[in-house]
Amino acid sequence: MIFPVALIHPIQAPPTKKEEYTMLIDRREFLKLGSLAALSGSVPGLVHATSSTLATSSQPVPDGKADYTLRMGRSLVELAPDHIVPTTVFNGQFPGPLLRFKEGQQVVVDIHNDTDTPEQLHWHGQFLPVDVDGAAEEGTPYIPAHGMRRIAFTPGPAGFRFYHTHLTAADDLTLGQYSGLVGPVYIEPKREPGAYDREVFLTLKEFDPFFSKGGDMAMDFLSPGDRNRTLEERGETAMKNSLARGQPHGYEVGYQSFAINGRMRGHGEPVRVKAGERVLFHVLNGSATEIRSLALPGHHFKVVALDGNPVPHPAEVPVLWIGTAERVSAIVEMKHPGVWVLGDLADDDRNRGMGIVIEYAGHRGKPRWVSPRPFSWDYRRFAQPDARPVAPDDVIEMTFAKLNAADRGFNAWTINGVQFDMAAMKPMFHLRHGKRYRLRMHNASDDIHPMHLHRHSFEITRIAGQPTGGVIKDVAMLGGYQTMEVDFTADQLGLTLFHCHMQLHMDYGFMALFDCV
């Protein structure tokens, strides 16, 4: 959660990036046309000036009726009877429809774009070729404005994934993940992790975004909490020097409304349960920028999967902490009858909508909320005891840094001193197919960064100097002034995007490309 220092209201947006955005679209369309000529009729994709090609191109797209149809368009979302917001959604609803796939069974999807802006649709957490993954930086063709694109792919891996826009928003709070373009995906596994009676999907999302100045991000919920003194000194010195030069704090984004499954607390249908029932909650943090928490008074969550991947050590916790784009699958045994609020720990956010009512059969009345005791979120809790991760073939050192208010009042972000160039889109790291790599990430800022790797999953192997293993994810929260190590096998040829999943960070430089040959 961001605690704003000073709000700008009404919103005074910084100078627009429309001209830059138009230039980028034109360049990418040019590259797309070039790829069509180069590939002589094969599936369209972008060809970049790198050593890699679209070696893992998508499957031939069959004719006939699609298995699924997704339509991006403007709509009104009724968060509450007296609070209706305009935004862009899938199929006229928020969240987008739940898509259930079978692992290994090809699907055909028609994606319609009824907006005035070329769009991208990213299949988050799946191992897909670059021309369907849904990132322009990798080479995925745009879905043209008022146009359509049909794609075919084989879903995988099994588990809880999701789909969302992957458009640069910059200073436009109607675009990208500030919009309602997000929906859940569940790829049926051969065997479910844990026994349960039924499942419930929850998508957490904020609405009515606005710009604010400065603010501090709470991070005392993360464990281990040890900070690296060298990183802290570097980050704090850079901030002090910036402020001493008269620079204000960089823009942040806040929100006025909060919802679960598109309804503010108390304005949607409750989750109706029976005593003794075991409910598997699949929780998606669909936020553009926020870290969320959830608690259900009198109950515990048995976490069985993170980001759709079964954990080695399922464990009960009183609170879920979920970074931007993370997913948690947890079983709750209903053994405390009553009417309760399943909600965020932040009182302001919960009172403004971030909650849903859990109603036991035979019980009525005002939903109750009881704040839980302080609890630290630690990925190691779900790890393999005494895990000894396989030694990598190579280690890639990465340092993340913030340049306060450096881009028209917005914070700019760098990886190893380089701000990602949306015009050039050059790979920073070169990989060999089949090799195992360790990303050693050093965070020289006080922000938490939910780090995401496209087209792969990774194993968390060290957090703040503490070894661990066995937890497989595609997004992981890296604490302020902390280090984290994650291992992955470069088994996807071509370009792979790596970035902080906070829209405000990735739009201003916090991205890098891997090129695997």
Positions of predicted regions on the chain:
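Terminal connector regions
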Residues: 171, 338-359, 501-510
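Histidine-centered copper-binding motifs that mark active-site loops
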Residues: 24, 34, 47-324, 330, ...
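A structural feature that tracks compact, well-ordered secondary-structure segments
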Residues: 282-286, 292-297, 331-333, 341-347, ...
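N-terminal export signals
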Residues: 8-9, 29-50
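C-terminal soluble interaction/assembly domains
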Residues: 461-491
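C-terminal structural cap/anchor segments
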Residues: 396, 403-406, 415, 420-446
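Active/binding-pocket-proximal capping segment
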Residues: 297-310, 416-418, 444-471, 503-507, ...
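N-terminal secretory signal peptides
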Residues: 1-29, 33
